[in-house]
Amino acid sequence: YTTLFRFMLPSTEHSEINFDHPDTLETELLIKHIIDLREFKAVQVPIYDFSTDMRKTETFTVEPRNVILVEGILLYVEPELRKLFDVKLFVDADADIRFIRRLHRDLTERGRSTESVIEQYYATVRPMQREFVEPSKRYADVIIPEGGHNVAALDMVTARIELLLK
């Protein structure tokens, strides 16, 4: 996520930011990092603190590899980012499964309340899913149904990755 200094909002207004909109992501930095990794250069990745809605001062190092996996629900929204991927996968999960996963994550990892997660889901998560995520899946080379539990699709993806590693 982009730093909140960009939005110039006091911390009391952070909850008003739609963090599910692509504009809140540091897409340019991700593009730079992927290009660097493809050129076999290590990158320093920022660590985002969801409890403060800010970046931490420390980063972590990602070393280049022959295969780079990049995960995120908004990856295919930006055309320049899409161009960097050799294979584009979209893991399709039912809305109720996505919501349950998000609820569990936000309760256990981010200290959120059930009410705040539900409110955010209706206010921003679901609308952004419909506006950006669902339409962007048409750019995927492979759509994996059943939330990633489709064995046949996973076997095909595994075979493709193994080919890339040879």
Can you name each region flagged by the protein language model?
Residues 42-43, 64, 114-120:
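Short, basic, glycine/proline-bearing loop/turn elements
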Residues 56-110, 165:
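ATP-dependent NMP and nucleoside kinases share a basic, alpha-helical "lid"
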Residues 7-56, 67:
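Conserved nucleotide-sensing/catalytic segment adjacent to the nucleotide-binding pocket
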Residues 63-64, 104, 126-166:
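NTP-dependent small-molecule kinase module
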Residues 30, 89, 140:
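Residue-level signal for inorganic ion chemistry
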Residues 23-31, 92, 111, 115-118, ...:
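Amphipathic alpha-helical transducer elements in NTP-driven molecular machines
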Residues 1-4:
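Short, small-residue-biased leader/transition segments that mark boundaries at the very start
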